[in-house]
Amino acid sequence: MTQAGRNRHYSIDLIRQMADCDANYIRLLKLMPELESFRSACLQSLAGCASGPSTEGRIPDFTLRDFVNVGALPADAICTREFAMSSPVGDGEEVRVRISVVEIFRYTSTLEIVQLTRVSPWVSPPGIMIRLYHDAVTAEAVAYQGHKAFLAKYATPNSRMYHRDEKRQINEFLGEWLSLCLQDGRSLTSPTFICSA
């Protein structure tokens, strides 16, 4: 190995990573307009905290009942949308993707995006858990195919066989997947999320 090869190392491009995560948040808001209610509640909560002495620095709580029309949504997900796209292998079968909100907290929400249609018997359909940070207006992949807690950078080789920039690649893949849903997908479910303001 040459001296130049030894000195070459991966450096994190934080600006690019944050831009990818911010763009993913915007894509998710377009795919699931229901998420705007979570974002609005978070911003109102932040504004209420800074509004003055009447709040005494306490951030007001809101619960799922503030968002969900009781009984109108499935028990396993607070909000679910499904999209269908044409198959990339051209066999005429539609590829279905489901996006579900699985957790809601004051400033964050957790979503799961999974491909329901198996395109190939040799490849598992992808699945990603996404954390949305409503106060920071960003979204990042926190788990992919059962792997989680990704570091920003890995040494190579490593025991898990991750790429040096595994986290960036997963967030980039998420962006491409969401873009595909926006461009070629059609929603199979109408919005079921009702805000009780």
Regions found by a protein language model. Give the residues of each.
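Hydrophobic residues positioned within well-ordered beta-strands of beta-sheet architectures
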Residues: 97, 111-113, 128
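Short beta-strand segments that buttress and anchor functional surface loops
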Residues: 85-87, 112-118
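Eukaryotic low-complexity, non-globular regulatory regions
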Residues: 1-94, 98-108, 179-197
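An exposed acidic His-Trp-rich patch
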Residues: 115-196
